[in-house]
Amino acid sequence: MAGRSAVSASSKWLDGFRKWYYNAAGFNKLGLMRDDTLHETEDVKEAIRRLPEDLYNDRMLRIKRALDLTMRHQILPKDQWTKYEEDKFYLEPYLKEVIRERKEREEWAKK
């Protein structure tokens, strides 16, 4: 039983650290999500290209708003910040698919 409580305590501590780091990064204060801040490699660019139109438009709106806020040296009101619990990794499934396809092409090229 002691092992489970230690795991639970470390899990809570780790989750608390994740939330702290999420807020410390600052992108949420501009209304951005984690996937909006990814470095745009070729794989990420292809994943963005494959996004459904509504997700792509939402992403562009968040990025444009963040740029505007940054230019004016402002942040959103606290009630409009992206919350850790609400941030979803919307790009991840598309990115995994792109990476899988690229690795498959590389394997075929080796043969």
Swiss-Prot record:
<dbReference type="GO" id="GO:0005739">
    <property type="term" value="C:mitochondrion"/>
</dbReference>
<feature type="modified residue" description="N6-succinyllysine; alternate">
    <location>
        <position position="12"/>
    </location>
</feature>
<keyword id="KW-0813">Transport</keyword>
<feature type="modified residue" description="N6-succinyllysine; alternate">
    <location>
        <position position="88"/>
    </location>
</feature>
<keyword id="KW-0472">Membrane</keyword>
<feature type="modified residue" description="N6-acetyllysine">
    <location>
        <position position="96"/>
    </location>
</feature>
<keyword id="KW-0007">Acetylation</keyword>
<dbReference type="Pfam" id="PF02271">
    <property type="entry name" value="UCR_14kD"/>
</dbReference>
<feature type="modified residue" description="N6-acetyllysine">
    <location>
        <position position="19"/>
    </location>
</feature>
<dbReference type="InterPro" id="IPR003197">
    <property type="entry name" value="QCR7"/>
</dbReference>
<feature type="modified residue" description="N6-acetyllysine">
    <location>
        <position position="83"/>
    </location>
</feature>
<dbReference type="GO" id="GO:0045275">
    <property type="term" value="C:respiratory chain complex III"/>
</dbReference>
<dbReference type="InterPro" id="IPR036544">
    <property type="entry name" value="QCR7_sf"/>
</dbReference>
<dbReference type="GO" id="GO:0006122">
    <property type="term" value="P:mitochondrial electron transport, ubiquinol to cytochrome c"/>
</dbReference>
<keyword id="KW-0249">Electron transport</keyword>
<comment type="subunit">
    <text>Component of the ubiquinol-cytochrome c oxidoreductase (cytochrome b-c1 complex, complex III, CIII), a multisubunit enzyme composed of 11 subunits. The complex is composed of 3 respiratory subunits cytochrome b, cytochrome c1 and Rieske protein UQCRFS1, 2 core protein subunits UQCRC1/QCR1 and UQCRC2/QCR2, and 6 low-molecular weight protein subunits UQCRH/QCR6, UQCRB/QCR7, UQCRQ/QCR8, UQCR10/QCR9, UQCR11/QCR10 and subunit 9, the cleavage product of Rieske protein UQCRFS1.</text>
</comment>
<comment type="similarity">
    <text>Belongs to the UQCRB/QCR7 family.</text>
</comment>
<feature type="modified residue" description="N6-acetyllysine; alternate">
    <location>
        <position position="78"/>
    </location>
</feature>
<keyword id="KW-0496">Mitochondrion</keyword>
<protein>
    <recommendedName>
        <fullName>Cytochrome b-c1 complex subunit 7</fullName>
    </recommendedName>
</protein>
<feature type="modified residue" description="N-acetylalanine">
    <location>
        <position position="2"/>
    </location>
</feature>
<comment type="function">
    <text>Component of the ubiquinol-cytochrome c oxidoreductase, a multisubunit transmembrane complex that is part of the mitochondrial electron transport chain which drives oxidative phosphorylation.</text>
</comment>
<keyword id="KW-0999">Mitochondrion inner membrane</keyword>
<feature type="modified residue" description="N6-succinyllysine; alternate">
    <location>
        <position position="78"/>
    </location>
</feature>
<feature type="modified residue" description="N6-acetyllysine; alternate">
    <location>
        <position position="88"/>
    </location>
</feature>
<keyword id="KW-0679">Respiratory chain</keyword>
<dbReference type="GO" id="GO:0005743">
    <property type="term" value="C:mitochondrial inner membrane"/>
</dbReference>
<feature type="modified residue" description="N6-acetyllysine; alternate">
    <location>
        <position position="12"/>
    </location>
</feature>
<dbReference type="GO" id="GO:0045333">
    <property type="term" value="P:cellular respiration"/>
</dbReference>
